[in-house]
Amino acid sequence: DIRLVMNDTKLTPNSGPAGGSRSQVMSGNACRLAAENLLAAMRKADGTYRNYEEMKSEGIETKVKGNWVATYCADHPVDQATSQGEPFSVYMYTLFLPEVAVDTMTGKVKVEKFTVVTDVGTIMNKLVVDGNFYGGLAQGIGLALSEDFEDLSKHTSLLRCGIPYILDVPDDLELHYIETYRPEGPYGAAGCGEAPLDAPHPAILNAIYNATGARITRIPAKPEVVLEALKAL
């Protein structure tokens, strides 16, 4: 049996937060190395593998304790004054193409379709990646058009804060994957958490501009905000 220990710094080193879309790269590489160490111990000279009893009888360790390992220090220069540069070794790249309908009489915006083209490296688990993007698109629609947490005296629940309803999310969501191998990711994978959360909302604002010529510079782009921008044209 394999028992996975998580979030216990008594047994596993603290590797930092799950930020910067680093979880798959960090945890994935750690899991890969652990599995490779285990397989190396199990492998026989003829290419077959020992079972647990055989390993015990031959005095082969059945438990491998990991250690802090640094094979090299990568050169990723960053300008501390401007934060420009390459602070990470693995990145994701995504194009968001929303199609919106704008009611110029009321200012109401409806996202009718969302097409996504993304390169997140080797896809390890497509259902998980799909879930990241579908969830991120729904959040992006809410962030762009309805979610407002500024007035907490008024918005006393998630519902009243403008979380999108299921009818606000289009059925027509297209995800297209390009798999470019990342040498420093586990089996060529990159992260996939930040792209679907960071970029859908500005893409929606750009779609409103493309449809109407009205440039929205603040979110959420509620009907009154869109109507104000339309009247200013």
Please identify what each model-predicted range represents:
Residues 7-137, 143, 148-168, 225-233:
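Cofactor-centric catalytic regions
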Residues 4, 114-116, 175, 221:
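Hydrophobic/anchoring residues in structured secondary elements
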Residues 3-5, 167-189:
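Generic long, charged, amphipathic alpha-helical segments
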Residues 186-205:
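C-terminal structured "cap/appendage" subdomains that terminate the fold
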